[in-house]
Amino acid sequence: CEITDEKSIANAFKEITEPVDIVINNAGYFYEPLETLDSMNFEEELQMIDICAVGPLRVVKVLRDMKLLKTDGTCKIAMITSQGGSISWREVQNPDGHDYGHHMSKAAANMGSKLLAQELKKEKIAVQILHPGFNKTGMTQKYEKIWEIEGAVDASVGAKRVMHEISLM
């Protein structure tokens, strides 16, 4: 589905007939070139924010509007973000800057997820922000040269990490 469009999201969920107890909200988009102040494409910056930060909120809103989230205390929403949204991490790991859109989108996703957790708490819906680790994917391939140095893992390992954390919610 197109995560930037509520109708597309609703269409993706139209065959679900019962409320769900687990939602794994994993949206990502990373513009390919290294983004610097001199080279950034503002349309791409906004698209990353729309997909990575606003998109997951749209998914939850649509599921909630369609009455597809359990409200009996068993619903768990995992919001997959990234350490790339951490200001502290940027100071330690990559102090030279760049890649504005992706990192701003993940910082916004972190805040949106926290606000969502606060709002849905009264509905007995748990929301947790999860970072599955640095995964070897097509999206991170532009950093392939540092995968081993930075401890990047196969996406299946990242998925297992997420499932483990959900089991603890």
Regions found by a protein language model. Give the residues of each.
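Rossmann-fold cofactor-recognition segment
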Residues: 1-7
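Short-chain dehydrogenase/reductase
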Residues: 13, 60, 113, 159-162
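Conserved hydrophobic beta-strands of the Rossmann-like cofactor-binding core
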Residues: 19, 23-24
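Catalytic loop of short-chain dehydrogenase/reductase
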Residues: 29-30, 36-49, 65, 69-122
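PG/GG-rich flexible active-site loop of Rossmann-like NAD(P)H-dependent oxidoreductases
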Residues: 82-84, 129-136
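Short, small/polar-rich loop/turn modules that mediate ligand/substrate recognition or access, typified
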Residues: 126
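C-terminal helical subdomain
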Residues: 129, 137, 141-169
